[in-house]
């Protein structure tokens, strides 16, 4: 039997697993399904259509599934809603908005950690095992791969893709795609690749060396970008290289390299760390 605080308000088609705990002043509206082991600490607002998987913990002030911040979106339109996987943590005042589309929901994967005041806008697609520091912002339709880490105040432009294993530094902005395992150290400025993260993730030394080589081709080379892509294609056949090539060739907003906004101090620090 779910534990529901007497001050909580549930209205609509609400489906709760038997061990769900709902704290004081929570509000659940519309078609909402909450999976086993979920806990709503207090003052959490859930708006359907919303599917919340198992083992998610939501802290006070979280608002999940409300209408997009899109002036052309009718407030009462449901659309495809929001789908959240398992084992996620949403700290205080995290917001996730439902999709504008009818065929694909806003989607959050498994085991992600959203620190306080993070925001995932409408139609965002987020993978698994990510960590987003306070005030990280993902604009509409952004796509985020697995094991991405952001510093506080990082911002991602609409439709931008962040490849798996990438890192975005605090207060950094991305209006171009960030390749898998790259590190963003200033706005659209790649400062290196995530060697430590790859080691911690169990990648073999040969895999790390391959990513280092691809980083050199994409970021440090000064030949036209089409020639860089051609050089990448000579590495095809390795799973990491194939993933990387597909990511680069699939870009619609361009790839972050070393032509972004970086102070001389940060640029020098990045160069020393290579």
Residue ranges and their predicted role:
Residues 3-185, 189:
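Structural signal for interior beta-strand "rungs" in well-ordered beta-sheet cores
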Residues 1-7, 12, 18-19, 55, ...:
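Terminal amphipathic alpha-helical/low-complexity segments used for targeting or macromolecular assembly
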């Amino acid at each position: 039997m779910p534990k529901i605080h007497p001050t909580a308000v549930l209205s609509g088609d609400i489906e709760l697993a038997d061990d769900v705990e709902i704290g004081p002043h929570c509000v659940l509206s519309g078609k909402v399904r909450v999976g086993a082991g979920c806990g709503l600490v207090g003052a959490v607002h859930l708006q359907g259509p919303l599917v919340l998987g198992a083992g998610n913990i939501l802290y006070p002030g979280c608002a999940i599934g409300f209408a997009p911040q899109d002036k052309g979106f009718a407030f009462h339109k449901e659309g495809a809603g929001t789908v959240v996987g398992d084992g996620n943590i949403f700290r205080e005042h995290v917001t996730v908005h439902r999709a504008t589309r009818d065929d694909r929901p806003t989607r959050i994967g498994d085991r992600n950690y959203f620190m306080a005041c993070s925001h995932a806008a409408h139609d965002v697609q987020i993978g698994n095992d990510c960590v987003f520091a306070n005030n990280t912002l993902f604009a509409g339709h952004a796509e985020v791969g697995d094991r991405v880490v952001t510093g506080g105040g990082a911002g991602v432009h609409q439709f931008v893709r962040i490849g798996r294993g990438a890192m975005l530094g605090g207060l950094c902005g991305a209006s171009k795609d960030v390749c898998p395992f790259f590190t963003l150290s200033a706005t659209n400025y790649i400062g290196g690749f995530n060697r430590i993260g790859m080691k911690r993730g169990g990648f073999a030394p040969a895999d790390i060396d391959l990513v280092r080589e691809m980083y050199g081709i994409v970021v440090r080379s000064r030949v036209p970008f089409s020639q860089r892509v051609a050089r990448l294609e000579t590495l095809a056949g390795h799973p990491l290289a194939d993933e990387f090539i597909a990511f680069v060739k699939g870009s619609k907003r361009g790839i972050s390299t070393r032509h972004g906004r970086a102070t001389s101090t940060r640029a020098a620090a990045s160069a020393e760390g290579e």
